[in-house]
C-alpha cells in the first residue's frame, strides 16, 4: 500500500492492454507471402489435420496463420491477406488468412456463411 506522499510523487500506473495480434501493428489486415504451407494436429481432446501457413508479412514479421474452409490453393510464395483471430485448439496460431483475397481462392460450393469464405453467390437455378 503506497503512502499519500508516494502517490503524489508518482501516481498510479495505467495498465496497458496487450494486443491479441501484435504483428499487425494496429492494422485490420496485412499482406504477406507464404513461406511454408503444412498441416498440424490440434491439442487434446480434438483430432484433425488443420491447414496452416507460415507467412512473412509486409513488415517483415513472420507469423503462423490458419487457412479456413474446406480445401485451398495456397503454396509457397502465394501472396495472402492476413487478419487477426486465434485458433483455440492450435497453440501459437493467432492469425487467419482471408479467403477470396489476393492469391487465396474462395471456398468452392459454399452456400452458407459465404462472405467469411470468399464464395460468390450461386446462380439462381443451381441448388
Curated annotation (Swiss-Prot):
> What SUPFAM superfamilies would the database entry show?
Nucleic acid-binding proteins
* Modified sites of kind 3-methylthioaspartic acid: 89
Q: InterPro entries this protein is in?
A: NA-bd_OB-fold, Ribosomal_uS12, Ribosomal_uS12_bac
Start and end residues of each stretch annotated as Disordered:
1-25
Domain of life, per the record?
A: Bacteria
Q: Give the CDD domains listed for this entry.
A: Ribosomal_S12
Q: Which Pfam families match?
A: Ribosom_S12_S23 (PF00164)
Q: Name one GO biological process term.
A: translation
Q: Please give the GO cellular component terms listed in this UniProt entry.
A: small ribosomal subunit
| GO function term, MF aspect, one | tRNA binding
NCBIfam families for the chain = rpsL_bact (TIGR00981)
The record's note on quaternary structure and interaction partners says: Part of the 30S ribosomal subunit. Contacts proteins S8 and S17. May interact with IF1 in the 30S initiation complex.
Q: Identify its protein family.
A: Belongs to the universal ribosomal protein uS12 family.
Stated role: With S4 and S5 plays an important role in translational accuracy. Interacts with and stabilizes bases of the 16S rRNA that are involved in tRNA selection in the A site and with the mRNA backbone. Located at the interface of the 30S and 50S subunits, it traverses the body of the 30S subunit contacting proteins on the other side and probably holding the rRNA structure together. The combined cluster of proteins S8, S12 and S17 appears to hold together the shoulder and platform of the 30S subunit.
Its recorded name reads Small ribosomal subunit protein uS12
Species, as recorded: Symbiobacterium thermophilum (strain DSM 24528 / JCM 14929 / IAM 14863 / T)
Amino acid at each position: 500500500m503506497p503512502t499519500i506522499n508516494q502517490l503524489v510523487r508518482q501516481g498510479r500506473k495505467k495498465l496497458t492492454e496487450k494486443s491479441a495480434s501484435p504483428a499487425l501493428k494496429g492494422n485490420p489486415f496485412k499482406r504477406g507471402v507464404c513461406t511454408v504451407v503444412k498441416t498440424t494436429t490440434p491439442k487434446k481432446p480434438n483430432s484433425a489435420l488443420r491447414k496452416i501457413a507460415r507467412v512473412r508479412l509486409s513488415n517483415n514479421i513472420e507469423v503462423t496463420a490458419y487457412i479456413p474452409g474446406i480445401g485451398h490453393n495456397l503454396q509457397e510464395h502465394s501472396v495472402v491477406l492476413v487478419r487477426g483471430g486465434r485458433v483455440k485448439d492450435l497453440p501459437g496460431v493467432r492469425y487467419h488468412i482471408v479467403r477470396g483475397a489476393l492469391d487465396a481462392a474462395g471456398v468452392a460450393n459454399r452456400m452458407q456463411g459465404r462472405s467469411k469464405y470468399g464464395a460468390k453467390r450461386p446462380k439462381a437455378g443451381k441448388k
